[in-house]
Curated annotation (Swiss-Prot):
The encoding gene: leuS
Protein name: Leucine--tRNA ligase
This enzyme's EC code(s): 6.1.1.4
Residue interval(s) of motif 'KMSKS' region: 629-633
Substrates-to-products reaction catalysed: tRNA(Leu) + L-leucine + ATP = L-leucyl-tRNA(Leu) + AMP + diphosphate
Amino acid sequence: MHEQYSPREIEAAAQSHWDAQKSFVVSEQPGKDTFYCLSMFPYPSGKLHMGHVRNYTIGDVIARYQRMQGKNVLQPMGWDAFGMPAENAAMKNQVAPAKWTYENIAYMKSQLKSLGLAIDWTREVTTCKPDYYRWEQWLFTRLFEKGVIYRKNGTVNWDPVDQTVLANEQVIDGRGWRSGALIEKREIPMYYFKITAYADELLSSLDELDGWPEQVKTMQRNWIGKSFGADIVFDYDVASIGIDGQLKVYSTRPDTLMGATYVAVAAEHPLAQRAAESNPAIAAFIAECKAGSVAEADMATMEKKGLATGQFVIHPLTGDKLPVFVANYVLWGYGEGAVMAVPAHDERDFEFANKYDLPIKQVYTGEGKDYDASTWQDWYGDKAGLTTINSGKYDGLDFSAAFDAIVGDLEASAHGARKTQFRLRDWGISRQRYWGCPIPIIHCDSCGDVPVPEDQLPVVLPEDVVPDGAGSPLAKMPEFYECTCPKCGAPAKRETDTMDTFVESSWYFARYASPNYEGGMVDPQAANHWLPVDQYIGGIEHAILHLLYARFFHKLMRDEGLVSSNEPFKNLLTQGMVVAETYYRTLENGGKDWFNPADVEVERDAKAKVIGAKLKSDGLPVEIGGTEKMSKSKNNGVDPQDMIDAYGADTCRLFMMFASPPDMSCEWSDAGVEGANRFLRRVWRLAHGHVSAGLPGKLDVASLSDEQKAVRRAIHLAIKQASNDIGQHHKFNTAIAQVMTLMNVLEKAATATEQDRALVQEGLEIVTLLLAPITPHISHELWQRLGHADAVIDAQWPQVDESALVQDSLTLVVQVNGKLRGQIEVPASASREDVEAAARANENVLRFTEGLSIRKVIVVPGKLVNIVAN
């Protein structure tokens, strides 16, 4: 055994052993407990960042721990390989997205391997390969035929220069991020998943997910947004509108209908369009609305604007005429594209009414409540503790009674009905992009939209295309889109839109169970053997979209008979971000020039807080920006490869797991990395000294001295606490702290006798086993050096010897009037009276109680004695 810890050699040897033995290749073993551990797969952006390292190390620690519990563990990996970054890189570098993607995958795979992750690489999936996406095309055709996927017009952000649809994030101040052109709202045909058909189940089955963070479940509940209300129908005022008809709105507060003073419609609503025909101002306002963002978040924060159309509708209960406004805050794709406005009890309507001098009619009041129509107060929107006023026959009712009475009358007059509604909208998956999965539909003039037959799948995406950013490349390739109709044989046109890349990541977890299966999307037998995933790990930023879509897809696959479980992920761990300090200088134009922490020399105070910083290259000061998520934009990232090259993967892994609990942010610290490396060198040094003296004989537990019992107690206390920390709570940082505490004991332990050395042997074996999931390479080497023929990867997690934890005697602190005055050692079985007597008799305690009257003695069993005297 070398005297010096050499991570490069140790890690290469361990990884070589795992590869040769196929240590992580798993197959179904009926009768053996399974554990499916999955970290969210990466986008192949070019190289790993520290967020990846943290995510995959957390997963690996859990997977290795479960393997040591004797389970058959599956931990696969793949690549979420379609998406816009590849197209952007292709345009920048004039290279096909496929080439860029596959080169990135090769490099990132080598990085993942260098981390020593226990991954079954035989199950690797790459979502941009036809053998993967053919199966989502197959599912698409099945769902299209069932009506779960349908086609309709959808409103999108259209860039008239680049001739393409932009995501909301690509619209900056109303202009395209690349072209700078003013963005238009445009309606184009798109394909939709009918996720709303599963809204009730997606909501109710959240209650079954006991292993998910409550925060994530709450976010999903709010996103699905189940609400109880009513459809309310307002008859057209024929004199002002010119035609007969009805305006329908949905409201969660029909109880406030008597306070409605106007209605607002979206720019695309037929009433708005009708008004625009004869009113140029309305036509111009509609054009302005259409140029705005279609993002709900933007709608919430933008200035609310409206214009009176000159039209009126009839209040269904009072017969009053209510003016119709066209407003920029009403979305055509949501509900009926119209809302009833009750300014007195809705904050948005209140602001709008005050802006345009519209009536505000209070219909709720409460004891001690004063209503002021010029200033919004939060109670205006409450339901509880209020009663109706100014509502005619509905006066004096609480929320529930007013709701029932008003909806009852609306139903009786055919002007409304109770309705349960969801905030969730159907999932539009059409993308006018190249680098995505082709939508398997053929458009025929005679037959309409025809799914591509199964024997013609996959529809293969050509991989030699270099996009130029103007429109969809596929729409310019007759060799791709020209085809014949599968039904009638006539010339037809293939769909040139591709699928939202969230589709690929919505079912990959199931494909891992049978990645090479050619008989279907998944092999149901293999899928049901492994699924649901026992532990899923990923960032909180995926709480809604990815996790909701994956749950939806799992239910779609269940209904196709592919899986038998209802939910894809039993337990979810959302890891925190990796953050680091930031430094910058302000430029003349007001921008910021960010410097990497490695290029900055810092001055710290006694608490290690940065109080000064200067650039190493010129010695001049830089501004301290605080700690933020590692990112390219802030130039505060640390390349994992540099860390692995300098310290080894085990140091990297140990630091990541020790720096903070996995669900909290992890602050990068060079000193912390060096500390982790120092600790591993300590373990190596102790093991080297022990092994060099020759391995001892067997430990005789029955003949241990009190000092030896104390050492053995520390060993088994570490097992007990680390088992609880890793196995029950995923508190890897406190488990590592237990191992460090044990190391302190072992370094001081006696080595004079064979029994002493046998005890240190047991201690080192336990240190090795407890560290094995966290620092697997050094553990692999130490296990062999400690005399074991089997590899530590095949070892069992250590068991606690409860008898070792039993103490013959206890050391208790003795206080006098709350101040430490001595220590006593008493038998573990000592009575309260014996403990009190020993405390009173302590020499130092006698000195501090001399001449005082002892009023009472407080004994805290196993901890302390406090003598109160005056």
